Structures are given as C-alpha cells and as structure tokens.
Amino acid sequence: MSFAELGSRIPRSAGEAAYAQEAFGAPLLSTMLGWAVVAVGTVSAATMVHGFVGYLSVFAELPAIPVIFLCVAGLTAIAIWGIGESLLTAAAITALEAAGLVFVCVVAGDSFASFADDWMRILPDFNQTAIFGVVSGAFIAFYAFIGFEDIVNIAEEVKTPEKTLPRAIVIALLVSTGLYVLIAIVATYAVPPETLAGNPAPLAAIVESRGFPPGIIAFISLFAVLNGALVQIIMASRVLYGLASGGLAPAAFARVNPRTQTPIFGTMIVASVLLLLCWLLPLLSLARITSFIALAIFTVVNLCLLQLKRKQTVRPDFCVPRALPLAGAVLCVAMIAYESINFLR
C-alpha cells in the first residue's frame, strides 16, 4: 500500500531512489537504495532461473549451466526487444501462470473439504521450535510477494501513472494473495509434508498425487518462472536507467537504443551478473538474500512515505493511513532482526 501511494505521489523510474531523495534529500541514501533495488531484481531473477532448471528436470535431466546460459540469453533478448513487446509477453505468461495455479486448486479440490473438516491442522504447534520454523518459513515465503513493487519502476512508460499505478499494485496484491492462500491450503492437505520437502517441482508433485501427468503443471511452471525472471531483468535495467538519468550511476546506463527504445547496456550488465549469481549460489541462498535486501528496502520505503506525509500537505489520488507505513516499517525491521539472529546461531 505504501508503494501504491508513493507511485501516485512520485511517478518516476527508479521509484525507490526517487522516493528517498524527495523525502530526505539525501543523495547517498537514494543511491544506496537504487542499487539495492537493482540487487534485489538481479538476485531474484537468478532465483527464478534456478527454479526453471528444477521444473525442467521433470522432463529431462540436463546440465544446469548450459540450460541457465540459454535461458538468460533468451530472456535478455526479449528484454532488449522493446518494452511494449516485453510486457505483452510477460502479461501473456502471467495469464498462463494464473491458469496453472487454478488448475492445481481444481485437481486437488478435495483438499478444501479436508481443510473445512480439519482446519486446525494448518496451524503450527505452539512450541518454540514450531514458531521459529514458521517465522523462518515466512521470511523465505516473503520472496513470493516480491515483484508487485516493480510496477513503480516503469512509471514513466505508463499512461496517467498517478491513477494507474496504485490501481495496478492493489489488484496485483489481492489476486496474488488469494491464489497463494488457496495453494497453501492445497499443499498442506493434498500430500504429506515430506513429499514436498526438498522437491524441485512441488506443484507438479501435487498434480501427480491426483493422477494427472506432472508434465502439465511443470510445463506451465517453466513459463511462470521465466516470466518472473524477465520482469526482474526489465525492472533492474530501468532502475539503472533512472539512477543514471539522475546522475547517481554511470551515464552509460542511461543510453537508450534508438530503434528498440530500451537500455541495452544496462540490460546486458544485469544479465551478466545474473549468470554469475546462478553459477555461484544455490536457490535457497538466493531466495534468502532476496528477501533480506527487499525487507530493508521496504523499511526505507515505508519511512519515506511517513516523511512525505509530514512534509507534503496535498493529498494524492490514492492515500493510506499513517499507521499503515509505520506498521510496515516495524514489521520489516522485526523480520530482519529475527532472521539475522537466527542466521548467527
């Protein structure tokens, strides 16, 4: 919700960096925040490419490195192709992805009856080990919600962003939350936890448990993770463009190809770092790093909104209560602190 209001107040590329500059007038903070957003996008894309390799294993066991290279090369080509073409591709794959999640819920629909009869099963035991496990799981699961905030980073390529951006963010959050809740119920009641633990293609395992070929959902999941990686590559390159346009990054990142109207240099740099991360780190480590950096960014973004509400008297088209960004900042700090302590144990 904080992103929705900030997108209405300050519709610019490199949104988070622009928010920090407008709120606190601190170029160093803006620069750090902008580069942190680029890092989140790049690490997140690397996580998704690893996920692609996992779902591809349902069809064939192929060497990971060549698959990753071809995958990143293809995504980079689409991102360079043009913003209109890239987003049209992303929208089409998003529709396919949503259809896949609905398919999982339908084929494992008996899980909802089990949930109605035994809803207490979804609750953890109230002991220290279980609670710590749930919080740690929530930290990693937070990664699933990363992406909605990327909408603000293409603000300058959106018509009437003051109204369109908040609406898009709210709709994205509501739809994704609803689907994730349904999938969580299905995953809890459809198959034993040990079946899903460590499974590289968990949704395929759920579908297979109901007598359907796992290849159906694995095929859809392949496109889903590619779509997520594509969006992150586009976002990271646009943030680099915004930073360079504001003098906060090398000018080369602000160069736009006259034919494709895309920042080719920035896109290539993001893709190169993405390949390096895929080679160096496993999926779970990438997801943890992404969540940690994203929570730090969200903390600052919530503080930016609180500061702007204090400084600016004009209400934007979309406005949230002050308590919302305050609660968001406190919750993000609490999750960072807990996971940091847990990591050091």
Predicted ranges, named:
Residues 89, 128, 252-264, 298-345:
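C-terminal membrane-solvent junction of multi-pass transporters and transport-like membrane proteins
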Residues 18-21, 26, 54-58, 170-233, ...:
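TM-loop-TM module centered on a large, flexible mid-protein loop between adjacent transmembrane helices
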Residues 35, 39, 69-77, 95, ...:
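Generic alpha-helical transmembrane segments of integral inner-membrane proteins
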Residues 53-56, 64-114, 128, 169-173, ...:
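Membrane-interface loop-to-helix entry segments
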Residues 63-66, 91-215, 341-344:
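Helix-loop-helix junctions that connect adjacent transmembrane segments
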Residues 9-15, 22-29, 156-166, 171, ...:
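Juxtamembrane helix-boundary/capping and inter-helix hinge elements in multi-pass membrane proteins
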Residues 30, 64-68, 72, 129-137, ...:
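Residue-level signature of transmembrane alpha-helical entry/exit and packing/kink sites
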Residues 1-72, 77-80, 94, 221-242, ...:
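Hydrophobic transmembrane alpha-helices that form the core helical bundles
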